[in-house]
Amino acid sequence: MTAIRPGSVTFENVTKKFGNFTALPNLSLTVEPGTLVTLLGPSGCGKTTTLRLLAGLEHPTSGRILIGGKDVTNLPANERDVSMVFQSYALFPHMTSLENVAYGLESSGFKKNEARERAEEGLKLVGLGGMGHRLPAELSGGQQQRVAVARALVLEPQVLLLDEPLSTLDARLRRRVRTEIRELQQRLGFTAVYVTHDQDEALAVSDTIIVMKEGGIAQKGSPRDLYEAPASAFIADFMGEANVVPCEVISAENGEAVIRVAGLTHRVPARNAQPGPAQLAIRPNAVTLQPQAGGGFSGTVAHSAYLGDHIEYEIETEHGKLFIVDPAVEQSLPLQTDVSIQFKTRGLAIINQ
């Protein structure tokens, strides 16, 4: 393999319709060379359609798609200089790992010996050197996933596309393989567009996350930006769960805001807060509970569940039920206990109305 040639991706006012249904209305986005960008969102948000348009498996109704600055809008998939890792890996069960990786090269016109050499190099890149003789059934799920990545990378694409590549793995293996994907992308420096509905997965692997909703971009930013500074209640809840309650921003200056919630004032990071009515997003682990209700923000324990290293509570308040995660497992609160709710310094975000 020669050096990786990471390419950029640009969507310019792309619309995709299926009959009378508009899946993507006027979508514009960019992916910088050498970065891993995740398209994240619930089912039906348009992320898979976006990936298929980029791959050339679908064509836009209007707008332009560019890869590495080249207009590929009307090019077929085999002329786009992208490779895809499918959800199912799509490995041939009767072929060895080496033969699977070499298959795309041979189909692209490489001679068998050269294809084999490149395939061996590709397997080494993903940590499977010396395992080319094994059939897919003789590999773990994570190893099969790496074979699929190697098969895509040996074609030296400008952009690697990953369509929910970890969805068939169990939870423990997903954590390990997502770390391997991120390490490989950073080490080799290829451009990757990654589709998932799993928020933890997106936070772990991405340089940039694009959260999609109803065919559009709800918010784009770094994992930390989206988690700590959500632009809407939808983003706050989608990126790791949040309790959203009404508040009033009294003042915001020098990076700090003074807010009023349930008659009490609190100081939180201001970010882009503006004085006036707003919403406060509260992460489940951003509060402490005290077993006595006084003035201010208080509630009653409506439900609890012991989960080993923490307890999950539902607290009934005047603003509805709050979902709380409490690490103090030795001090579980009985049902119907009246509690006061106190905010920690982190895990709070103001959402402007």
Swiss-Prot record:
ABC transporter domain residues are 9-239
Catalytic reaction equation(s): Fe(3+)(out) + ATP + H2O = Fe(3+)(in) + ADP + phosphate + H(+)
The record's listing under InterPro entries reads:
AAA+_ATPase, ABC_SmlMolc_Importer, ABC_transporter-like_ATP-bd, ABC_transporter-like_CS, Mo/tungstate-bd_C_term_dom, P-loop_NTPase, Transp-assoc_OB_typ2
Give the source's domain of life in one word. Bacteria
**Per its UniProt record, what Pfam families does this chain match?**
ABC_tran, TOBE_2
- Bilayer topology term: Peripheral membrane protein
Residue positions annotated to bind ATP are 41-48
Which PROSITE patterns does its entry note? ABC_TRANSPORTER_1, ABC_TRANSPORTER_2, FBPC
Q: Which GO terms describe its molecular function?
A: ABC-type ferric iron transporter activity; ATP binding; ATP hydrolysis activity
Task: Provide GO CC annotations from the record.
Answer: ATP-binding cassette (ABC) transporter complex
Record-listed E.C. numbers: 7.2.2.7
Which compartments is it annotated to reside in?
Cell inner membrane
**What keyword terms does UniProt attach to this protein?**
ATP-binding, Cell inner membrane, Cell membrane, Ion transport, Iron, Iron transport, Membrane, Nucleotide-binding, Translocase, Transport
Subunit structure, as described in the record: The complex is composed of two ATP-binding proteins (FbpC), two transmembrane proteins (FbpB) and a solute-binding protein (FbpA).
The role this protein plays is: Part of the ABC transporter complex FbpABC involved in Fe(3+) ions import. Responsible for energy coupling to the transport system.
Question: What family does this chain come from, according to its entry?
Answer: Belongs to the ABC transporter superfamily. Fe(3+) ion importer (TC 3.A.1.10) family.
Q: How is this protein named in the record?
A: Fe(3+) ions import ATP-binding protein FbpC
